Amino acid sequence: MKVKSQKDYTIAVIGSHSALDVCRGAKDEGFKTLVVAEKGRDKTYAKYFKSRGPSTSSGRASLGCVDEVLYVDKFKDILSAKIQNELKRKNCIFIPHRSFEVYVNDYDAIENKFNVPVFGNKKLLRLEERIENPNQYDLLKWANIKFPKRFKNPKDIDRLVLVKAQQVKVSFERGFFFASSPTEFEKEGKKRIASGLISKQGLRDAVIEEFVVGTGVNFNFFYSPLAKRLELVGTDTRRQTNLDGFLRLPAPLQIEATRYLEVTFKEMGHTAVTLPESLIEEAMEIGERFVNAAQQKLSPGVIGPFALQSLIKPVFPKLEIIVYDVAPRFPGSPGIAATPYSGYLYGKSLSMGRRVAIEIKEAIKQNKLKQITT
């Protein structure tokens, strides 16, 4: 069959993280959608948001956004020849997000054994892991982007730091704690080892970063290789449990609560935020430097979405952006469609899922799919 339009393609995604954002955007641009779901974790996609009713002229079903569910016993089974052949038979373009990385848990296999066309640069995904070489810190250095000071040795701690250690039971989650001295680092680390949250090795391998006091803003960018343009699709901030609950308490009660509860930083979602327009130019320039560094060091560089998770720090009389985390793939931020930035560019607000689908649709039209997939 000769492929002619988006109707001949299916947009595929792992059933987790931001799959609905991907699927809604794809449906709105006339694509078929497929979610790879683990058995027993499928109702969100196979029932509650399943496509229903006849398609409209745009290719959009009257209700829902998931056309088809492909079942696997474990998400890692997506690497099997059987599942890959099925995805290729359906002419799928696969959209990677954080859960894809986490559940497959094998970047070498993603790069070398997953042969379904992937929207984006697969080589960038592993940068998210701070233990990789190179990693996100290296890319930020190459791009001359400011990030929190790191301490390689806890004996050098001379200010308030945030310690990020891999959890024992959930390896892709990190256990966080604060310390302001080597003694406090040792005390707090031992406490979490005793509770079973982290291991001794996890503490030895922990990332120790200066705690930056500022306002959290995630800059969700999209780089279009077709238009050679960087776009700010939207901005948001994290919601974390039980941290958000602690912050709602008056300070004396926060101190009292920590006698019985440990503060945790489990991500539970995002809230849309806006920026002062005076900060947009700096944010865009930082994004451009990131794109340029990736193109020079990790060809073909950035393709599509990425997020620079940042803190806005007051440096009188200006504001300064400090990037504390990089998401080199589709962000888990469906609420960014509520921010105005894509609307300023396109005349209507776009979700990241819609922006990705627009790029794929244009690449099909220009016969340049190979330019946006790896």
Question: How would you name each of these model-derived features?
Answer:
Residues 209, 217-254, 320-327, 336-338:
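Beta-strand scaffold of nucleotide-dependent catalytic cores
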Residues 19-24, 42-44, 171:
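Short N-terminal binding/cap micro-motifs at the start of the first secondary-structure element
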Residues 31-40:
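Short internal beta-strands
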Residues 12, 126-217, 222-233, 277-284, ...:
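Active-site nucleotide/adenylate-binding loops and adjacent lid/helix of ATP-dependent enzymes
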Residues 45-52, 63-161, 168-171:
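Conserved N-proximal alpha/beta basic substrate-recognition cap immediately N-terminal to
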Residues 6-29:
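N-terminal phosphate-binding or glycine-rich loops at protein starts, especially the Walker A/P-loop
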Residues 247-320, 359-374:
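A long amphipathic alpha-helix within ATP-dependent nucleotide-binding catalytic cores
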Residues 3, 317-374:
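C-terminal active-site "lid" helix and adjoining low-complexity regulatory extension at the edge
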